[in-house]
Structures are given as C-alpha cells and as structure tokens.
Amino acid sequence: GLVNLQALPDFIAANKRNYLIYSEALAGVDGLRLIAYDEADTPNYQYVVIELESPVAGGRDAMVAALHAENILARKYFWPGCHRMKPYRDLYPHASLLLPDTIKVASQAVVLPTGITLGADDIETVARIVAMLARSGRQAP
C-alpha cells in the first residue's frame, strides 16, 4: 500500500547498486549483453536482464538450467510471450507468424537475481558463474 512508497527510494537504490555491480562484472564477456537502462527515464532497476547472443551453446534454456543447478534462481524473461498465453493464443493462433523479433528476443533473455537481500559478494558470484557458462558454452568457430 501507500506505506511501501516510503521505502521505494531504498528499493530503487539497492536495485541500481545491484545492476551496476552486474554491469561491471559482466562487461566484456563475449556471448552476452546486459540490457541497459535509459537514464533519460526514471528506471527502478527492478530487472537485471542479459541477452544471450549466438553462438552461446544451448542458449537461454541451458543457461537457466545450469544456473538453477548452482542454486541461482534465474528466470526466462517474459516467457512464454503473451501472444502464447490464454486468451491470446486462442484468439490469435497465428500471432507468432507476425512476431518473429519478439520470439527471438524472448528466447535469448535471462533475468538474473536481484533485490535488497542480495549483497555485492552474491552478485559477483552469480556474475562469475554466468561469465564462466557463457565462455564454456561458446561454440568453436
């Protein structure tokens, strides 16, 4: 409720701190890209999203499964797409044909854990594991 609004600046500050730690830790890792926030907006940094670029072997599903195996609660980002959920999939069964970019991006996006309970050491550990998975999962040219 309204009482939570008092804590909002603290939540946003913690989320931004986490995002910046991830940003520094994942900078320069081939095969993935941290989705940037537009500072012209007023972001709340609620999500830390990486986009896996090919040729990361196994793609998003393999990355999420490997992170879960390490007890890191990463998630597929906006999966399935709304167009594949009721009632839209029934009302518009051919929507996927019109949304190839949506399907592509959704199949490459991973949400990393964040929030006020995560410390810098935890985030750096997650980032190290993500970087290791990205490096070890790359296909040979």
Give the predicted meaning of each segment.
Residues G1-P141:
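PLP-dependent aminotransferase class I/II
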